[in-house]
Amino acid sequence: MHTTQKDTTYTKIFVGGLPYHTTDSSLRKYFEVFGDIEEAVVITDRQTGKSRGYGFVTMADRAAAERACKDPNPIIDGRKANVNLAYLGAKPRIMQPGFAFGVQQIHPALVQRPYGIPAHYVYPQAYVQQGLVIPHVQQTAAASTSPYIDYTSAAYAQYAAAAAAAYDQYPYAASPATTGYVTAAGYGYAVPQPLTAATPGTAAAAAAAFAQYQPQQLQADRMQ
C-alpha cells in the first residue's frame, strides 16, 4: 500500500531570522496560539548541530497558517523574524521608514548641488558648473605677484645685475706665494646671464681679460 503525502502548500510556514538559541520546542510554543501544529523544526548544521537561523512550522489547517502569517515580522525569542508560506519563499523584513536597503539618506539641501558637494568646492570647468568659486588667474597677474613665474630676460636681468655689482666689491687678492701670477683687477664670480643678453662687446671683453694669462709668462714665474 502506498501512503498518500498530505498537501502542505498552504499550511507549511517558513520562519527566518531566528536567534541561534531558538529550539524546536520554543518555536512550537510561539505558533501554538494560532492553531494546532503538526510539526515545528529548527534547521541545524549537520556537523556542528547549531541552528542555521531558520526553521519550518506546519499548521494543521490553512486558516491557522493564514493567522500565523498575518504578522510578517513577529518577535520570536527576542528577535524580529520573518514569516511567510514556505512555497512563496522568504519575505524580506519590513524596513524602517526613511531607510532604503542600506542606501544612506542625503540631506535635501545637498540634492540640488552636483554630486552632493557644496557648490564652492566644485571646479567650474571640470563639472560644467559655471560661475563658482575657483577663479581663473591671469598670467600677467601671476607674473607680477610671483618672481618664479616669468623667467624672461627682462625679469631676470635685474637680479643678475644686482648680483654682479655686489660681488664686484670684493676683488680677489693674490697671496705672497703667488706674487708672480698676473691677476685681473676687480675679479668677481661669474653670474649667469640670459642668452638674449649676450653681445659681441661682452665676448670681446671676456677674451681680453683671459688674454693676460700668457702660458710663457706663467711658466717663467713658476721657475723662479
From Swiss-Prot:
UniProt xrefs under CDD domains: RRM_RBM24_RBM38_like
GO CC list: cytoplasm; cytosol; nucleus
Comment, domains: The RRM domain is necessary for mRNA stability and mRNA translation regulation.
Gene Ontology MF, one: pre-mRNA intronic binding
Cellular localisation: Nucleus; Cytoplasm
Listed Pfam families: RRM_1 (PF00076)
Function: Multifunctional RNA-binding protein involved in the regulation of pre-mRNA splicing, mRNA stability and mRNA translation important for cell fate decision and differentiation. Plays a major role in pre-mRNA alternative splicing regulation. Mediates preferentially muscle-specific exon inclusion in numerous mRNAs important for striated cardiac and skeletal muscle cell differentiation. Binds to intronic splicing enhancer (ISE) composed of stretches of GU-rich motifs localized in flanking intron of exon that will be included by alternative splicing.
SUPFAM superfamilies: RNA-binding domain, RBD (SSF54928)
Upregulation: Up-regulated by the myogenic factor myoD during gastrulation.
Protein name stated in the entry: RNA-binding protein 24-B
Domain RRM: 11-88
Domain of life: Eukaryota
Gene Ontology BP, a term: DNA damage response
Keywords from the UniProt entry: Cytoplasm, Differentiation, mRNA processing, mRNA splicing, Nucleus, RNA-binding, Translation regulation
PROSITE patterns linked: RRM
Provenance organism: Xenopus laevis
Subcellular location, principal: nucleus
